[in-house]
C-alpha cells in the first residue's frame, strides 16, 4: 500500500547508520491513492454502516433490482465496498467487485464531463462560446446562439431526447401507430410504465444490417449494424428539433450529445479513445470503457434490459440507452460501463482537484470551476447534478447531503455523489432495468437516497 500511495508513510531514524544515513533522516510520503481501511480510522461507526445492507436487502426482497455494488470512501480511505445479489433474477451469477455495470446518464459526469474539462484545460473552448462555433451544421438553425455553458447547465431549451431509431424503421412495414398507452393485439410489448409498443415492424435494409459489412460498421447490438451515414441523420434531427425556452432548466440528453461532438472536434480524436488514453488507463481503471465487449469478457458485464422492442435481445455489454446505441455506443449522454472501484478513482480525482496517484490530470482551477459552479435558476452545476436545498422528493440526494455535493444519477439504476465538505465518495451501481425498464421500485423505495443518509449518520 505504501509503495503505491495507498497509505501515507512517515518515519525517522533514531540513530545513524554509518556511511549511509544520519540520525533524523526519514521518509515522508503522502497518501495519493484510495486504500482499504477500517471505518474507525475516519471515526465512522461500523454498526451504522451496517444499515446500508438492510436497505439493500429491502430492495432485493421487493425486486427493485437483482443486485448492486455499494462503495463509500472518506478521506481517501475505502470504508465500505460490498456487492449484493445477482446479475439477474435467475440468481445463477453473483455480483462481485469485478462486475461491470452500464452507468447510463452517470456517464455524463464520469465520462463526457471529464473529456470536456480536459478540453477546457487545454483552452479548446470557453463557456461563453457558441456550440455552433464547433458544430457548423447548427449555424443556420435556431440553435446557433446556444452557449456551451447553457448545455452544461441544462438550460439550453433543447428537447429532453430524440428517438433517432424512428428514422431507421420502415414505415411501410406496419399499419397504425408504433406506440399505445394500453396493451392490445397490435401493441403487445410493454416499453415503460405507461407505454406499449408493437414489434411487427422491420428496419430499412439500407440502414440496418444483420452483419457487419462495408458501410455498416456502427454496431447497435448483437447482429445489428447501422449504416455509417446515420450520423448525418442524428445531427439533422438535432438541428430540426423543437427548441424551448433558453435560460430555463430542462434536462436534456441532447446537450451532452453535442458536447461530445464539440470535444471530439477540438481534441481531434474520438472521445472514448481520449478518455482511455488520458485518464482510465493511467488511473488503473481497467474495467471502465465504452463498448466494453471490446476489452472485457461478457460474463463480467451485468445485463440490463431484455429489449423486445428495438434490438429484440437481452442487452449485455451493449448500451441500454437507444440514443447512445444509434451512435455506436459512444455518446455524450450515455455509454460508459464501469464498476465501483474504477469509478471511485475518477471521483477521487475530482475530489483531489484534478490529481490522483501523484499525477495532476486536470488543473485545480478547472476542477474548482466545474465542481463548485451552480446555475442561478436551478440546482444544476456545470455538468454535475446537485442537491435541492432542503431535500425532499425533488432532490436526487438524501436529506443530509450538504449543498456542496455534486454527482449524477443514471436511468439503469446508478448514482455517484462527491462531498468535498466531508471528503466523501458514495457510489451505488445496479441494473434495476433488468428485465424491464418499467420497474421503478428503486426510485419509489428511495433506495439510493436512504443509503446516502445512512452514510451521513455513520460518519457524524
Map each language-model feature to its residues.
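Short active-site loop at a secondary-structure junction
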Residues: 62-69, 91-154, 242-255, 331-334
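Short, solvent-exposed loop/turn and secondary-structure capping segments
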Residues: 81-84, 161-167, 290-292, 429, ...
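Short, conserved catalytic-motif segment at the N-terminal edge
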Residues: 43-103, 124-126, 235-239, 314, ...
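C-terminal non-catalytic regions of proteins with extracellular/luminal or membrane-system context
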Residues: 1-43
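Short, surface-exposed loop or secondary-structure junction motifs
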Residues: 144-404
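Short, P/G- and charge-enriched loop/turn segments at secondary-structure junctions
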Residues: 57-58, 100, 370, 400-406, ...
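Residue-level preference for non-acidic, small/hydrophobic
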Residues: 3, 45, 56, 70, ...
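Structured C-terminal helix/loop/strand segments within mature extracytoplasmic catalytic/sensor domains
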Residues: 408-460
Amino acid at each position: 500500500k505504501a509503495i503505491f500511495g495507498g497509505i501515507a508513510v512517515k518515519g525517522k531514524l533514531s540513530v545513524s547508520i554509518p556511511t549511509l544515513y544520519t540520525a533524523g533522516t526519514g521518509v515522508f510520503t503522502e497518501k495519493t491513492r484510495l486504500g482499504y481501511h477500517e471505518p474507525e480510522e475516519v471515526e465512522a461507526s461500523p454498526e451504522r454502516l451496517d444499515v446500508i445492507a438492510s436497505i439493500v436487502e429491502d430492495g432485493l426482497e421487493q425486486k427493485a433490482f437483482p443486485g448492486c455494488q455499494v462503495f463509500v470512501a472518506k478521506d481517501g480511505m475505502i470504508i465500505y465496498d460490498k456487492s449484493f445479489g445477482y446479475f439477474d433474477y435467475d440468481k445463477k451469477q453473483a455480483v462481485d467487485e469485478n462486475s461491470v455495470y452500464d452507468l447510463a446518464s452517470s456517464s455524463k459526469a464520469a465520462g463526457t464531463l471529464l473529456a470536456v474539462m480536459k478540453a477546457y484545460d487545454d483552452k479548446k473552448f470557453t463557456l461563453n462560446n457558441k456550440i455552433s462555433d464547433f458544430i457548423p451544421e447548427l449555424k443556420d438553425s435556431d440553435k446557433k446562439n446556444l452557449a456551451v455553458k447553457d448545455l452544461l447547465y441544462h438550460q439550453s431549451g433543447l428537447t429532453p431526447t430524440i428517438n433517432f431509431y424512428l428514422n431507421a424503421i420502415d414505415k411501410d412495414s406496419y399499419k397504425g401507430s408504433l406506440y399505445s398507452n394500453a396493451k392490445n393485439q397490435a401493441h403487445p410489448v410493454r416499453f415503460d410504465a405507461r407505454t406499449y409498443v408493437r414489434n411487427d415492424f422491420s428496419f430499412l435494409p439500407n440502414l440496418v444490417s444483420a452483419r457487419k459489412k462495408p458501410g455498416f460498421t456502427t454496431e447497435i447490438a448483437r447482429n445489428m449494424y447501422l449504416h455509417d451515414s446515420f450520423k448525418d441523420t442524428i445531427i439533422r434531427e438535432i438541428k430540426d428539433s423543437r427548441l424551448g425556452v433558453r435560460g430555463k432548466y430542462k434536462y436534456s440528453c441532447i446537450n451532452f450529445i453535442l458536447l461530445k461532438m464539440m470535444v471530439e472536434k477540438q481534441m481531434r480524436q474520438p472521445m472514448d479513445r481520449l478518455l482511455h488514453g488520458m485518464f482510465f488507463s493511467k488511473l488503473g481503471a481497467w474495467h471502465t470503457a465504452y463498448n466494453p465487449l471490446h476489452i472485457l469478457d461478457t460474463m463480467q458485464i451485468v445485463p440490463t434490459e431484455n429489449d423486445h422492442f428495438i434490438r429484440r435481445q437481452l442487452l449485455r455489454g451493449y448500451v441500454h440507452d437507444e440514443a447512445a446505441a444509434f451512435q455506436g455506443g459512444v455518446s455524450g449522454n450515455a455509454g460508459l460501463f464501469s464498476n465501483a472501484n474504477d469509478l471511485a478513482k475518477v471521483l477521487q480525482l475530482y475530489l483531489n482537484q484534478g490529481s490522483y496517484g501523484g499525477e495532476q490530470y486536470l488543473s485545480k482551477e478547472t476542477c474548482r470551476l466545474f465542481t463548485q459552479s451552480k446555475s442561478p435558476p436551478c440546482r444544476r452545476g456545470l455538468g454535475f447534478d446537485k442537491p435541492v436545498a432542503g431535500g425532499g422528493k425533488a432532490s436526487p440526494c438524501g436529506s443530509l447531503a450538504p449543498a456542496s455535493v455534486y454527482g449524477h444519477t443514471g436511468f439503469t439504476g446508478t448514482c455517484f455523489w462527491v462531498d468535498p465538505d466531508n471528503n466523501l465518495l458514495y457510489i451505488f451501481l445496479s441494473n434495476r432495468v433488468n428485465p424491464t425498464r418499467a420497474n421503478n421500485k428503486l426510485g419509489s423505495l428511495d433506495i439510493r437516497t436512504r443509503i446516502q443518509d445512512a452514510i451521513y449518520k455513520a460518519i457524524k
